[in-house]
Each structure stands twice: as structure tokens, then as C-alpha cells.
UniProtKB/Swiss-Prot annotation:
Catalytic activity: (S)-2,3,4,5-tetrahydrodipicolinate + acetyl-CoA + H2O = L-2-acetamido-6-oxoheptanedioate + CoA
Functional description taken from the UniProt entry: Catalyzes the transfer of an acetyl group from acetyl-CoA to tetrahydrodipicolinate.
Repeat recorded as keyword: yes
Pathway(s) this gene product operates in, as recorded in its UniProt entry: Amino-acid biosynthesis; L-lysine biosynthesis via DAP pathway; LL-2,6-diaminopimelate from (S)-tetrahydrodipicolinate (acetylase route): step 1/3
HAMAP family: DapH
GO MF term set: tetrahydrodipicolinate N-acetyltransferase activity
GO BP term, example: diaminopimelate biosynthetic process
EC number, UniProt record: 2.3.1.89
Keywords of this entry: Acyltransferase, Amino-acid biosynthesis, Diaminopimelate biosynthesis, Lysine biosynthesis, Repeat, Transferase
Phylogenetic lineage: Bacteria, Thermotogati, Thermotogota, Thermotogae, Thermotogales
PROSITE patterns per the UniProt record, alphabetical: HEXAPEP_TRANSFERASES (PS00101)
Family indicated by similarity: Belongs to the transferase hexapeptide repeat family. DapH subfamily.
Keyword Membrane listed: no
Protein name: 2,3,4,5-tetrahydropyridine-2,6-dicarboxylate N-acetyltransferase
Length: 233
């Protein structure tokens, strides 16, 4: 997605504070039409907006004996993605915004965060606690290591997004800065900070990252993608 489209969408979106409320009391006769309600005349679970619940509480405080409130977000502009639409393995605890593209056979591990407008290619693994920023483009059969950061570029809107081409391995805790392109088959060493484009089939390391060698057979073997981990059967 174009950055200005995302910015306009966020600016115009109705901000939401979604809640889940567990309430106990004399619930007969209370209008729950503003919520999705599950329960009976003594106990109920409400899914809805905080302001609606606040109003309900003020109007019926004498009837509600007790409640527990879970606030899921505050003035949120964008929902999380519907995970059922992806043909991918998405583990518990991954946070994926709406309007993210994820290719078939991709793997999103626990704690990974993927922001709006990002594209994840087929068979790519986003490892634990990695962050993929807004509009970042990651190709097919890549591995983004645990704790790595792929910078997002929604603000400023003129910035070029990160592009990671096919079959790239990004090591744990590496950082790819805004506007960088990592060429096909490249390897970014753990902890590297990549500030400029990486040529295809090279290994970069250090802060800032520099080319230390060309990809050889030994490196290919050490960084090989395991197809069995992408199996969805």
C-alpha cells in the first residue's frame, strides 16, 4: 500500500477502544443492544466499546453488583488481521495488523509483530519477536531471525520501504533500516545494522554492516531453508 493511503485511512478511521466486560447482578431489563452479549439475567459477558460500557455502568450501577473489564486497545485506528484468511502457520502471540499480505506456507512465530501494509512472501519465516514495519516487502523463502527489526516507513510518507528479495537470511537481532534493499540470496549476520543496499549473494556483518564475503557452498549449507517447517498438513 502507498504510505499516503495508509495515513489517510488511519486519520479518517473511527478510533476504537474495544473491551470485554464480565458483569454480575440483576441484568433483567438492561438493554445490551450496543454490545455482543452472552449470558442470562444474573451473569453476562459483553464485547463492545468502552464508552458504551461506561454509559451502561452509569445508568445501571444499582443493578450491577460487580464487573471485570479487559481493555484490548485505546483509540485504535486499525484492527488486527483475520488470521483465518491466511494459508500460513501463525503461532500464538503473533501480532498482525489488518491489510498485511502473507504468502502460502509462510511461518509467523510467537511474538512476531507485522505492521500494516507489509508483504510476507511464500514460505518465509518470521521468527520469534521479530518486527516487520509498515510497508516492508519480504520475498519468498526468507528467514527473518529472532528479534530482528525490518524498519517500517509510514512516516515520513516519502520514504522508500525496505525490500528484502527472495531467499535472504537475516540473523537474530539484525536491523534493516528504511529504504534498504537486500538482494536475493544474501545473508545478514546476527546483530548487524544495515544502512545501505546489500548486493545479491553476499554476506554482510557489523555496525554498520559491510560485505565480508560472497556466498559460498559452506554458507549455503549453513543457511539452508527447511521446507518441512513450512508444511501445513
Amino acid at each position: 500500500m502507498d504510505a499516503r493511503e495508509i495515513i489517510e485511512m488511519i486519520a479518517k478511521a473511527k478510533k476504537k477502544t474495544p473491551i470485554v466486560a464480565y458483569i454480575k447482578g440483576d441484568l433483567a431489563g438492561i438493554d445490551f443492544s450496543s454490545f455482543k452479549f452472552f449470558g442470562d439475567e444474573r451473569f453476562g459477558i459483553l464485547f463492545g466499546e468502552y464508552e458504551d460500557f461506561k454509559k451502561l455502568l452509569e445508568e445501571h450501577r444499582e443493578k450491577i453488583e460487580d464487573y471485570h473489564l479487559e481493555v484490548k486497545a485505546r483509540n485504535s485506528a486499525l484492527p488486527l488481521a483475520d488470521l483465518t484468511k491466511y494459508k500460513a502457520r501463525i503461532e500464538p502471540g503473533a501480532i498482525i495488523r489488518d491489510m498485511v499480505e502473507i504468502g502460502e506456507g509462510a511461518v509467523i512465530m510467537m511474538g512476531a509483530v507485522i505492521n500494516v501494509g507489509a508483504v510476507i512472501g511464500e514460505g518465509t519465516m518470521i521468527d520469534m519477536n521479530a518486527v516487520v514495519g509498515g510497508r516492508a516487502i519480504i520475498g519468498k523463502k526468507c528467514h527473518i531471525g529472532a528479534g530482528a527489526v525490518i524498519a517500517g516507513v509510514i512516516e515520513p510518507p516519502s520514504a522508500k520501504p525496505v525490500v528484502i528479495e527472495d531467499e535472504v537470511l537475516v540473523g537474530a537481532n539484525a536491523v534493516i533500516l528504511e529504504g534498504v534493499t537486500v538482494g536475493k540470496g544474501a545473508v545478514v549476520a546476527a546483530g548487524a545494522v544495515v544502512t545501505k543496499d546489500v548486493p545479491p549473494y553476499t554476506v554482510v556483518a557489523g555496525v554498520p554492516a559491510r560485505v565480508i564475503k560472497q556466498i559460498d557452498e559452506k554458507t549455503k549449507e549453513k543457511t539452508k531453508i527447511v521446507d518441512e517447517l513450512r508444511n501445513l498438513e
